[in-house]
């Protein structure tokens, strides 16, 4: 926020800060309102500043001033936000990482200033919010966390500009901490894996009847109306030599064959050792065949690179099932996907699928509940089929999908090793 009273009025006070104003008024009339040498009680910033100090989120400076226009350092930002959500604030860096204010891939200098965009991300993550948000109200910032705070009425700026690279000031931080403390981020959301997830209204819902999934041994059938469910396997070199005629005779209708993948640390691409043998064997046995690529793409460019790799290798094969991107999240150590944001993941998946469709194939992407809710913006992917993985009695994913991977320990004639089993749903 720029210096001067006019700039301060650009912050739209949410209800929780208005509550702080009421509390500050009570304290004023009781003679217990905090005073600052540089912030008048008539200053529009005073309620939030007084509220933040009274609540213990922030402290005035030693000389009795508050310095509302001075940049806040990272230690002050971390401390204020952690205290606002009722958590211990010391040791600051350790607690910041524990509560995701600072991601495992990020370095932190507690004495450095903090950009407004970064402060928004810290506040959103402290509140267990995701960066999957709608259209930005700001001309200069599309950051998902910034937009999410606007949607939740926690941090809103007038004038259509957010100035994301400016440092957050102490006055702005006071307002943000008070807003975070009073926010009801659970309204309309559901809880998954320590996050509050807002339902995606434009993504079609799961259409399947949970009671219509019937099990016999380690295989499942779907007996509900409206769909025919084909039985399938997805395989790679890990399954070794496969007798595809025996697979076909065991009632399998289709096979998804791995083309290759991307290494989880180096990021290099590799071929599956059994791709050529498997795809030709499955086709010769009369199975419906599709392919997949194990992805660790973290950008649109890498998604396109993976698509080009796959398209070159499947040229000339008659595929009647989708070309799928199997993006999976690996966290910790040297995994290249650690801490990657949904926008970057979705960029890669969308680029791959668009390239596959442009080449004349049906595109599909793979996800489990974690990736579907936390790591992908499914609103951008509704043009493509979803391959959903959940090892349970029935799939309870909120959104639609066309293929369900229901076990990794299946037993099929002709395949000596445990194998992934799938159902593919075809509308009647």
Q: Which ranges hold each PLM region?
A:
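Substrate-binding/catalytic groove segments of enzymes
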Residues: 129-134, 153-158, 364, 373, ...
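Feature responds to low-complexity, polar/acidic, surface-exposed segments characteristic
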Residues: 5-46, 54-147, 151-168, 179-191
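Solvent-exposed, polar/charged alpha-helical surfaces in well-ordered, non-transmembrane soluble domains
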Residues: 47-50, 75, 79, 94, ...
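Functionally critical loop-and-helix segments that line ligand-binding/catalytic clefts
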Residues: 189-232, 379-428
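Positions that flank functional sites
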Residues: 67, 164, 262, 297, ...
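Residues that flank catalytic or metal-binding motifs in active/ligand-binding sites
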Residues: 73, 115, 145, 150, ...
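Substrate-binding cleft of extracellular glycoside hydrolase catalytic domains
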Residues: 225, 229-349, 357-358
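Catalytic domains of cell-wall/extracellular-matrix polysaccharide-remodeling enzymes
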Residues: 319-397
């Amino acid at each position: 926020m720029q210096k001067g009273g006019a700039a301060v009025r650009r912050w739209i006070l949410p209800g929780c800060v208005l509550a702080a104003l009421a509390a500050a008024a009570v304290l004023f009339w009781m003679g217990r309102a905090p005073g600052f040498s540089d912030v008048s009680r008539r200053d529009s910033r005073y309620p939030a500043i007084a509220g933040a100090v009274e609540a213990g989120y922030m402290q005035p400076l030693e000389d009795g001033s508050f310095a509302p226009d001075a940049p806040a350092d990272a230690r002050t930002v971390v401390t204020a936000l952690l205290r606002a959500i009722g958590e211990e604030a010391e040791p600051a860096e350790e607690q910041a990482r524990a509560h995701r204010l600072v991601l495992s891939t990020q370095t932190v200098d507690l004495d450095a200033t903090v950009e407004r965009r970064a402060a928004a991300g810290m506040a959103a993550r402290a509140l267990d919010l995701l960066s999957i948000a709608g259209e930005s109200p700001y001309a200069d910032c599309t950051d998902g966390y910034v937009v999410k705070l606007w949607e939740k009425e926690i941090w809103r700026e007038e004038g259509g500009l957010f100035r994301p690279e400016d440092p957050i000031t102490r006055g702005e931080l006071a307002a943000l901490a008070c807003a975070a403390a009073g926010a009801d981020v659970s309204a309309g959301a559901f809880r998954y894996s320590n996050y509050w997830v807002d339902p995606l209204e434009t993504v079609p819902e799961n259409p399947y009847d949970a009671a219509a999934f019937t099990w016999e041994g380690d295989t499942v059938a779907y007996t509900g109306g409206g769909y025919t469910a084909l039985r399938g396997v997805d395989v790679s070199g890990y399954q070794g030599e496969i007798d595809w005629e025996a697979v076909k005779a065991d009632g399998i209708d289709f096979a998804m064959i791995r083309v290759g993948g991307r290494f989880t640390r180096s990021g290099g691409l590799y071929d599956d050792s059994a791709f050529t043998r498997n795809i030709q064997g499955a086709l010769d046995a009369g199975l419906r065949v599709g392919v997949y690529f194990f992805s660790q793409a973290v950008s649109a460019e890498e998604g396109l690179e993976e698509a080009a790799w796959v398209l070159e290798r499947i040229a000339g094969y008659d595929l009647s099932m989708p070309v799928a991107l199997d993006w999976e999240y690996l966290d910790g150590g040297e995994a290249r996907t650690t801490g990657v944001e949904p926008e970057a993941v979705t960029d890669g998946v969308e680029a791959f699928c668009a390239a596959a469709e442009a080449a004349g194939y049906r595109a599909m992407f793979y996800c489990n509940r974690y990736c579907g809710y936390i790591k992908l913006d499914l609103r951008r992917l509704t043009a493509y089929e979803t391959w959903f993985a959940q090892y349970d009695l029935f799939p309870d994913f909120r959104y639609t999908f066309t293929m369900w991977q229901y076990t990794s320990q299946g037993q099929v004639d002709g395949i000596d090793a445990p194998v992934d089993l799938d159902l593919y749903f075809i509308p009647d």
